[in-house]
Amino acid sequence: MRINYCENGCMLYYKDYIDLESCKFCQRAHFRKAPSGKKVDVKAMHYLPLIPRLKRLYASNRSAPHMRWHHENRRPPGVMCHPSDGEAWKHFDRKYPEFAAEPRNIRLGLCSDGFTPYSVSAAPYSCWPVYLTPYNLPPEMCMTSPYIFLNCIIPGPLNPKIMIDVYFQPLIDELNQLWIERVETFDVSLKQNFNLWAVLMWTISDFFAYGMLSGWMKTGKLACPYCMENTKSFTLKHGQKNCWFDCHRRFLPMDHEFRNMKNEFRNNTVDRDCPPPIYTREQVWERAQHFPKVTEEQPYKFDGYGVAHNWTKQSIFWELSYWKDHLLRHNLDPMHTEKNYFDNLFNTVMDVNDKTKDNIKARMDLPEYCR
């Protein structure tokens, strides 16, 4: 499915806007004239509909019987080998018992990240594929390539940043259809029709994409999505980078010996602060709902950005009526976290040229904050 979009990524020419001649935000032309005189779209993305592929899971005997695995193979308490063993899954079951009563209803995870296609080149090019995977299947199946569905490709060359929501509109429409209207599906393993219900459980991404998907940007002093405005981060005097050194002690028990260590962590500092409050789902939604969607108006930096909050938008995922009821909405990809940490540590210890974090400014900052 080919969908045209604005040259600047402001909007999709989709549904009510499919016949517009120019972007409703920046007024860039929808089409350009080819040498033959025909109208040719300036930019287009490719979208692969989700619903037909979910229905095909029940049309094959290779997958249909396994779509009930999460329900028929319960693990004992304390054992976790599948997302269905986690509290987020069980919480959703308790919140929507009608959904949980039908084990064939599908739970999905979404993943997206940018990459440079073909090879690294001098001219930067950022392409963003979006993947969905059903978690009903057993662990040895659900993360294999036949069951990781490419949903759309967000073309480059520029990183979409917070405008990534623009490209999610067709997916959100399908997810709302799967939740509100449901889809009649034939289950070949049980030889019967049923109304398929599906839910997006969470997203998985690296820390940068986390900000793009959630709306809370991961830059500046307020980058931490848990501490939010209660962060204890500071700017390095010489390096001028944001630092979260010694922010972890506040999470220890109040009588923990580490809290009283004056020089073992940040120089000449003890920590008596309580951990930051953990906001409930309702409190997060109460904050996010006041910000506009990038699909409805052009983004801008709101009052207090970077000082009182890091919100840049209301994420498009809030259009899913059940999104505010999830216990866990966004997950970090451990592969990126581990790789970035290892690369920085290894390159610094081994003094890899142009990749080490050990530099003059870092050396000047050390005596400022450490004994």
What do these predicted ranges mean?
Residues 1-371:
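Domain-level cores of phosphate- or acyl-group-handling catalytic modules
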